[in-house]
């Protein structure tokens, strides 16, 4: 698998949860579109959403054995709380992008702290579902550069 997308807590409720912040597309809508984009350029794409920090960590730990070359993660509420997820990403050494549907810097003060931003290749925040597409384009470019080496 080339690209792994991980989504944190409550993102399974996309489409109905606070549409003013998160839009009306469901997570299935978003991941179906991303799968098509990845497949069109010959990459494999897998996605998981979980409300459990431990399960997200397990997906990260398994990423190396699964041949993952790039991770896209929307840690959701774990953005502001999870040193464990941060450490898991550092442990596997796979490049990643951090994505947020809403602009976390235009929201409550507690949402402005990210445990991922300083170690991510990039942060995409506030562009709604299109932010995932931007992150996938970054992943595609990263993988293509690796293949040229």
Swiss-Prot record:
Record pathway: Metabolic intermediate biosynthesis; chorismate biosynthesis; chorismate from D-erythrose 4-phosphate and phosphoenolpyruvate: step 3/7
Catalysed reaction, written as an equation: 3-dehydroquinate = 3-dehydroshikimate + H2O
Annotated positions binding substrate: 74, 80, 87, 101-102, 111
GO molecular function annotation: 3-dehydroquinate dehydratase activity
BP terms from Gene Ontology: amino acid biosynthetic process; aromatic amino acid family biosynthetic process; chorismate biosynthetic process; quinate catabolic process
Its EC number(s): 4.2.1.10
Family to which this protein belongs: Belongs to the type-II 3-dehydroquinase family.
Quaternary structure note: Homododecamer.
PANTHER family per UniProt: CATABOLIC 3-DEHYDROQUINASE (PTHR21272:SF3)
Listed name of the protein: 3-dehydroquinate dehydratase
Organism: Vesicomyosocius okutanii subsp. Calyptogena okutanii (strain HA)
The gene coding this protein: aroQ
């Amino acid at each position: 698998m080339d690209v792994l997308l991980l989504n944190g807590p409550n993102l399974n409720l996309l489409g109905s949860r606070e549409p003013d912040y998160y839009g009306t597309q469901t997570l299935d809508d978003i991941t179906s579109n991303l799968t098509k984009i990845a497949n069109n350029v010959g990459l494999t794409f897998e996605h998981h959403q979980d409300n459990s920090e431990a399960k997200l960590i397990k997906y990260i730990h398994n990423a190396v054995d699964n041949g993952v070359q790039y991770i896209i993660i929307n840690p959701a509420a774990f953005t502001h709380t999870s040193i464990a997820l941060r450490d898991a990403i550092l442990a596997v050494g796979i490049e990643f992008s951090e994505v947020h549907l809403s602009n976390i810097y235009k929201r409550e003060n507690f949402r402005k702290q990210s445990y991922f931003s300083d170690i991510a290749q990039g942060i995409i925040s506030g562009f709604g579902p299109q932010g995932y597409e931007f992150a996938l384009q970054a992943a595609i470019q990263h993988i293509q550069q690796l293949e040229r080496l």
